């Protein structure tokens, strides 16, 4: 059964078509004027009148006349210069609510044309602890993969590790300085290396900053790191063995961190995985005439007529013979084309990388690696401190993501105790609830903003159980769960939904809007649309619950009907929370 909004759009589209006007002009939207009387509005008569060269109100009157006797229409009126206000027929509320209540997807349709979607997000570097900058990519990318899967698309997510570049040369050089006798540094030994890594994640976290500082202090040390990087990429066995250890140690730590955040990846590939593809890719680009020599380097010109800003060529191979980040990204596109062949690839990376991805995408299209529009940069803004600058620690350092999560969970625990919540559960259960609340606080705070918006990190506000926050939504879900338990104890079961009160209608219309919120979120790669829907739904249920007693209703049929509405709300709210990567506890 289509949504109420879609049903009204269809019959109004028929009315436009009967007057030989475009059917799409019949699209209705939620009304902001008198929504309790006329919940929907159509503005199509305005452009249609211009097209038909007639008065908008006169045209609107003809459209309303064409709606007479249509069973989906309860009432219609002309407003202002030619807007059409609409009220659905009463029977639609109960019918639609019953469908949502009986549907595992809570009324959400599947995508009409499912696709294979690759989502590249996370992108941490080997040997570097994740920082606050990884929060947005991780949370946004995870929500998008959940959303596209829910809509019926085949989704493959890839972390795309940064494991191929100068940072590896830095690590090798610093480790050699500390432990020069390690077998990996003996050029005469080419196999039989130890299976146990010579470093821990703590060692890597220490070695890289040390090496970076030394490289910045003097060109000699930087040159040594570059030489080590070149030998690694040329295939020196000992260095390749070290790289494997660095990756294994880092991935084990990253899986713990991402697991704590509730974020999943299908693939754990890195830049180094596509290195074998680069020579063939370069030769193919040359053979196609896509790449050309310029000042000793091999470049791909990507500027186009009509560009509003200058876009430099992509350097495929530097004048020193090195493959650069753009080359690796192109090889990754080739690898994904061969292994997954996605219809769409989303790169969830901060907006500062916009020019880089524009170069890569244009080069890929020019070489026939991707169709135009099949590669998309899902850009996002920064997480800032109260000073409006990127969030930093008190000493000016980078805020580690693990510390951020720990702080959120600690503050959530304090909030629970202040509110007297989760007080009658075991210490273990209380800790689990605090973790759910803390993660909900930082995830929802990030996702509720449109992704390109910078936002200020404020734990006190994020962990509040009041207002538009993750903890508020979790508490709203827990309230409904509590109601369902008490109903079961009283022997009350959900029944046929009978919509009568205005608050019931408002709740049904909110439930009805789930599909539109999903479409909005998917089309714009913007989970904030789901955040808005979840919050609006929680508010609508709160008003319904206050105005329409459930368990104390005198009429058993009304009691069963309202319980069914509560159950449908819980189902949809939990689905929405799940798409955002949030989980509501059973009790709080």
UniProtKB/Swiss-Prot annotation:
Keywords of the record? Aminoacyl-tRNA synthetase, ATP-binding, Cytoplasm, Ligase, Nucleotide-binding, Protein biosynthesis
Which reactions is this enzyme annotated as catalysing? Answer: tRNA(Arg) + L-arginine + ATP = L-arginyl-tRNA(Arg) + AMP + diphosphate
Protein family? Belongs to the class-I aminoacyl-tRNA synthetase family.
Q: Which SMART domains does the protein's record reference?
A: Arg_tRNA_synt_N, DALR_1
Source taxon at top rank: Bacteria
The molecular function terms of the Gene Ontology recorded here are: arginine-tRNA ligase activity; ATP binding
Q: Where in the cell is it found?
A: Cytoplasm
* Protein's name according to its UniProt entry: Arginine--tRNA ligase
Top-level class of the enzyme under EC nomenclature: ligase
Q: Which gene encodes it?
A: argS
């Amino acid at each position: 059964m289509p949504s109420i909004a879609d049903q009204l759009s269809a019959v109004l589209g028929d009315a436009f078509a009967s007057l030989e006007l475009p059917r799409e002009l019949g699209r209705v939207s939620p009304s902001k004027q008198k929504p309790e009387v006329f919940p929907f509005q159509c503005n199509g008569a305005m452009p249609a009148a211009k097209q038909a060269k007639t008065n908008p109100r006169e045209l609107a009157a003809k459209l309303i006349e064409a709606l007479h006797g249509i069973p989906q229409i309860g009432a219609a009126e002309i407003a202002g210069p030619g807007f059409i206000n609409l009220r659905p027929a009463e029977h639609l509320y109960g019918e639609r609510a019953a469908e949502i209540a009986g549907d595992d997807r809570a009324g959400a349709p599947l995508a009409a044309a499912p696709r294979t979607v690759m989502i590249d997000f996370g992108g941490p570097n080997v040997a570097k602890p994740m920082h606050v900058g990884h929060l947005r990519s991780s949370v946004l990318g995870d929500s998008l993969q959940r959303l596209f899967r829910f809509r019926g698309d085949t989704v493959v997510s890839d972390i795309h590790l940064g494991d191929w570049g100068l940072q590896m040369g830095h690590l090798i050089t610093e480790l050699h300085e500390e432990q020069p006798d390690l077998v990996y540094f003996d050029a005469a030994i080419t196999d039989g290396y130890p299976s146990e890594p010579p470093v821990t994640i703590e060692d890597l976290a220490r070695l890289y900053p040390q090496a970076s500082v030394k490289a910045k202090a003097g060109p000699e040390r930087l040159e040594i790191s570059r030489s080590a990087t070149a030998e690694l990429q040329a295939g020196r066995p000992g260095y390749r063995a070290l790289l494997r250890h660095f990756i294994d140690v880092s991935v084990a730590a990253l899986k713990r961190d991402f697991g704590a955040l509730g974020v999943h990846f299908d693939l754990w590939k890195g830049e180094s995985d596509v290195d074998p593809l680069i020579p063939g890719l370069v030769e193919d680009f040359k053979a196609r005439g896509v790449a050309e020599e310029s000042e000793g380097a091999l470049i791909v010109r990507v500027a186009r007529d009509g560009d509003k800003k200058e876009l430099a060529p992509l350097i495929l191979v530097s004048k020193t013979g090195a493959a650069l980040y753009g080359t690796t990204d192109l090889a990754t596109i080739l690898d994904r084309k061969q292994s997954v062949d996605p219809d769409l690839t989303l790169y969830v990376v901060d907006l500062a990388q916009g020019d880089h991805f524009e170069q890569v995408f244009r080069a890929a299209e020019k070489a026939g690696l991707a169709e135009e529009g099949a590669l998309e940069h899902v850009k996002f803004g920064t997480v800032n401190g109260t000073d409006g600058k990127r969030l930093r620690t008190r000493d000016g350092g980078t805020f580690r993501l693990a510390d951020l999560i720990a702080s959120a969970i600690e503050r959530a625990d304090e909030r629970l105790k202040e509110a007297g919540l989760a007080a009658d559960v075991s210490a273990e259960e209380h800790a689990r609830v605090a973790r759910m609340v803390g993660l909900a606080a930082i995830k929802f705070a990030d996702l509720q903003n449109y992704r390109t918006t910078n936002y200020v990190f404020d734990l006190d506000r994020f962990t509040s159980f009041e207002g538009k926050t993750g903890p508020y939504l979790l508490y709203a879900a827990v309230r409904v769960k509590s109601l369902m338990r008490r109903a079961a104890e009283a022997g009350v079961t959900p029944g046929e939904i009978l919509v009568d009160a205005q608050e019931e209608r408002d709740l049904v219309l909110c439930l009805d809007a789930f599909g539109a919120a999903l479409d909005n979120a998917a089309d714009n790669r913007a989970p904030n649309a789901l955040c808005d829907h979840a919050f609006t739904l929680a508010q609508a249920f709160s008003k319904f619950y206050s105005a329409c007693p459930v368990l104390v209703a005198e009429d058993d049929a009304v009691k069963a009907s309202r319980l069914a509405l509560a159950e449908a709300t819980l189902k949809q709210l939990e689905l929405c929370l799940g798409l955002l990567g949030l989980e509501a506890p059973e009790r709080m």
